[in-house]
Swiss-Prot record:
Location of the MGS-like domain: 1-149
Biological process according to GO: 'de novo' IMP biosynthetic process
Domain of life: Bacteria
Organism field: Chlorobaculum parvum (strain DSM 263 / NCIMB 8327)
Cross-referenced InterPro entries: AICAR_Tfase_dup_dom_sf, Cytidine_deaminase-like, MGS-like_dom, MGS-like_dom_sf, PurH-like
Catalyses which reaction(s): (6R)-10-formyltetrahydrofolate + 5-amino-1-(5-phospho-beta-D-ribosyl)imidazole-4-carboxamide = 5-formamido-1-(5-phospho-D-ribosyl)imidazole-4-carboxamide + (6S)-5,6,7,8-tetrahydrofolate; IMP + H2O = 5-formamido-1-(5-phospho-D-ribosyl)imidazole-4-carboxamide
NCBIfam families tied to this protein: PRK00881.1 (NF002049), purH (TIGR00355)
HAMAP family in the cross-refs: PurH (MF_00139)
GO molecular function: IMP cyclohydrolase activity; phosphoribosylaminoimidazolecarboxamide formyltransferase activity
Name of this chain's protein: Bifunctional purine biosynthesis protein PurH
Amino acid sequence: MSDPVIKRALVSVSDKTGIVDFCRELASMGVEIFSTGGTLKALQDAGIAAESISTITGFPEIMDGRVKTLHPKIHGGLLAVRDNAEHQQAARENGIEFIDLVAVNLYPFEATIAKADVSFEEAIENIDIGGPSMLRSAAKNNESVTVITDAADYATVLDEMKSNGGATTRTTRLTLAAKVYALTSRYDTAIAAYMAKAAGVEGANDTMTVKLEKELGMRYGENPHQSAGLYKMDDGNGTRSFGAIFEKLHGKELSYNNMLDIAAATGIIEEFRGEEPSVVIVKHTNPCGVAQAPTLCEAYRKAFSTDTQAPFGGIIAFNRPLDMETANAVNEIFTEILIAPAFEEGVLDLLMKKKDRRLVLQKQPLPKAGWEFKSTPFGMLVQERDSKMVAPEELKVVTKRQPTEEELADLMFAWKIARHIKSNTILYVKNRQTFGVGAGQMSRVDSSKIARWKASEVGLDLKGSVVASDAFFPFADGLLAAAEAGVTAVIQPGGSIRDNEVIEAADANNLAMVFTGMRHFKH
């Protein structure tokens, strides 16, 4: 079957970007245009000859526009197989004329539910019924019908029509049809997630639909022999994308490992959004230094002093605009990526002198809600993001001694960081600065040893520090080792069958200890 010449088009769009120019071109090629509601008005106001869909159906739009395109003369005109004699006869007998092109985009359901004050009724009214039905009918009959859901495709269709005798190619029609089913799948996923949330359904659904759309290509993955890319993801809770949150201002393309480190660094710095100046230094997704101080430069100096070797080639995130004093301090070493919510005047000029350094602007906070997906050889693990954080008033003091105000501030600082470190985690903190980071060890005792060793390597005195453990101390030995190092207060989830032994050891060493009741394993 040859490519069918486009003679009749049905146009009904919520996003009217480019639609007037598109239809003006169609009309100039002799295409008959039918439309609905606001789209029809926009075309007629622009002087384009377009007729109401009611001309085809013989039926008015009713029920506040809920019913206008759900009609056999519409779907028969879309679904009829053009070279099928029975279909042709049925069309003649029922007064159905073929529709060759459909340009439809859907009611903005996702944008509607993203509004903070949206009502359930408003959300429901933004569920498109006729649009998806027309799109799916047209896409099914892609051998004969061209279907457009994206204004970016208008030019492609027009160019092909001009060079192909008023028709599009089969390849283009198939490509556009595939976009339809991707769109309607994502659309229905968003509606299903919203309905489930409105009904109070919690936990992962029995079936989940996730749309991935390539956003960035990458030279390779974690290692040069692995191919990779970054994909926008829509899991029904809205689309998550790098470009919506970040903007690379300088430097070569970001790698797979860079993306992991950016996620890790900004995940920690988000904990201190709105607080006093804070700096996070990350290497291989684990923090090697985190600190708060009255100035950003002082916070950076403190974070750097935790580990004076690891920051080379590392990733640094700031919770305040990067100022010149801090930029000069950072410029003393090579760092691979700097991430900030803004860069003060002159800072970019200074930092851009090192061409291998990437500078990244964080335009908005990271989304906290949603699901986390981890691929395994035997399936996809799905869990709710670990976004819950214990408040100071929720801490349970289990020792005879209460933590002082200063200890409590350090304990909360440590707990915000500990949950972002690979388990097993032991973290020493003093004066809102990491003093020793023990990460990713199979034994909690080994993590503690590493943390103490790292502190001693740079001459940081643990006397008067606090310690955080991402999971409970299974025995008193870990706590006793911390006490021996000079710790005065402890924060941990609790929950061990030997909690009493650990509490007794804390009391015996005059330690203040609080339980969070919330474990933060990170694998």
